[in-house]
Regions:
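Sec-dependent bacterial lipoprotein signal peptides
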Residues: 1-20
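Ser/Thr-rich, Pro/Gly/Ala-heavy low-complexity intrinsically disordered linkers and tails
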Residues: 18-84
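Residue-level detector of buried hydrophobic side-chain packing
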Residues: 21, 42, 55, 98-99, ...
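N-terminal module-boundary/linker segments of secreted carbohydrate-active enzymes
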Residues: 74-108, 112-118, 132
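Electron-transfer interface patches adjacent to heme c in soluble/periplasmic c-type cytochromes
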Residues: 77-87, 218-227, 269-275, 279-282, ...
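Long, charged, low-complexity terminal extensions
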Residues: 93, 98, 137-146, 358-361, ...
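Short, solvent-exposed loop/turn and secondary-structure capping segments
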Residues: 109-114, 157-161, 245-250, 297-306, ...
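Extended surface/linker regions that mediate inter-domain or inter-protein docking
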Residues: 124-297, 357, 385, 394-405, ...
């Protein structure tokens, strides 16, 4: 019953609930307990929601569909603040939740007693988290986690999730996911619990890859007209936000809504400057709000064919009669270069990977996905399970200071005060 209590900051701003679940048992190898411990504390009822001035019911002043728990000044309501402060540390409940998340099993009786009877439960709990992170079951859970995050898996579609899991399990720099230039299509042997490095054989020479950005299975899975599905996959999986990716000062372009991208209006193609698709259309929505960024990213993926193989020519089509092959001017006019963001050019996929690896939003996205995993939330995109930046910022700092070791972040979150209090 931690769904109404764990991190009210996140609940108040995103409406996300956290729940625990059950699974089969697993015997871990841990020391025997030596002293008796107290039983698990129980939770009372959640506090009464804020009411309006007349006291006749809960309010939803901001119209977001959730009862207000933050007053107009931006301060958490006293009732909810009190509830947050009333949480108690329960390493037994935390151990159960962590074991289910990290191994897919319940903790063994020995593990439960080890924490329950330990002179310093916090230390004992941390030791068991370390054991879980070294367990082969964690590797399998990590692969499943990245299958879900990447929206792909099974057979050749496992190479990208397996590479991400390898970086996590082996405690490597996680930015290699976007920058590694070789051995980016590893395999995993479940029986032996081993990763085997392997090259992605799709026409790109070894030493010229860019992590999963050149993965053939990814390119095959998200093949589409103008490579827009590939660009969308990159944006949503690694930046944790949909298009439009960038917001600038509103500009009147003669439509019902303003143009809001930071790019110049004519930085992308339309039928008025050489393109065959009118990305300058303003008759309904302002297409360029999304396409200002998207059109600078998508051409980088246009030379992968429908099987994910690299070609010397553009291999994606236009959604027009007879499906003609796209040309560069369908995305960008003469003089424009591909880019990750405004003022961040990326002339090739390796440059794109480097720009993404240095992006604070990409750093925060990786940490947010771990946070949602730990707290039992859904996908930040598919389930719109957003997390306020201030909630994950301490762990983003940990991620940076550890040279982008995502495993360090996993441990930090699973041992965090907010994870062990109920």
């Amino acid at each position: 019953m931690r769904s109404w209590l764990v991190l009210l900051r996140a609940v108040a701003l995103s409406g996300v609930a956290v729940t625990a679940c059950a699974g089969p048992s697993f015997d871990g190898a841990t020391p025997d307990p030596t002293t008796p411990g107290d039983g698990d504390p129980t939770l009372g009822e959640p506090p009464t929601p804020t009411t309006d001035g007349d006291g006749d019911g809960p309010t939803d002043a901001d119209g977001d569909g959730y009862i207000d728990v933050i007053d107009p000044s931006g301060t958490l309501d006293p009732e909810w603040q009190d509830a947050l402060g009333e949480r108690e540390v329960d390493y037994g409940a935390a151990l159960r939740t962590a074991s289910l998340r990290l191994r897919g099993t319940l903790p063994s009786l020995t593990e439960i007693r080890y924490v329950q009877h330990a002179p310093e439960p916090r230390v004992a709990y941390g030791q068991l988290i370390d054991q879980m992170l070294a367990d082969p079951l964690f590797t399998r859970r990590a692969i499943d986690f990245f299958r879900d995050a990447f929206r792909m898996g099974g057979g050749a579609l496992d190479t990208a999730p397996v590479f991400a899991a390898q970086l996590l399990v082996e405690d490597r720099d996680f930015t290699e996911l976007l920058t590694a230039d070789t051995n980016t299509c590893p395999t995993y042997d479940r029986e032996a619990d081993t990763f085997t490095p392997a090259a992605c054989d799709n026409g790109i020479a070894e030493g010229q890859h860019a992590g999963v950005l050149t993965n053939p299975a990814v390119m095959r899975q998200f093949y589409s007209n103008l490579a827009f599905r590939r660009a969308r996959w990159v944006q949503e999986v690694f930046a944790c936000s949909p298009f439009p990716a960038e917001i600038g000062s509103p500009t009147d372009v003669g439509g019902e809504a303003p143009y809001t991208a930071p790019w110049a209006w004519d930085s992308i193609s339309g039928t008025d400057n050489g393109g065959r698709i009118d990305f300058h259309d303003t008759s309904s929505v302002i297409c360029a709000n999304c396409h200002a960024t998207m059109n600078h990213v998508a051409p980088l993926f246009a030379q992968f064919d429908e099987d994910g193989m690299w070609s010397d020519e553009i291999e994606v089509l236009l959604p027009l009669d007879e499906s003609p092959v796209a040309v560069r001017s369908d995305w960008l006019p003469e003089g424009q270069t591909t880019a990750w963001r405004f003022m961040e050019p990326a002339p090739n996929l390796q440059a794109l990977g480097m720009a993404m690896a240095a992006d604070e939003d990409v750093e925060r996205c990786a940490v947010t996905r771990v946070w949602n995993w730990a707290m039992g939330h859904g996908d930040v995109i598919s389930n719109v399970d957003l997390v306020p930046a201030e909630v994950v910022e301490p762990y983003v700092a940990t991620y940076r200071s550890s040279d982008h070791r995502l495993r360090t972040v996993v441990r930090a979150i699973f041992t965090a005060d907010d994870f062990v209090r109920f």
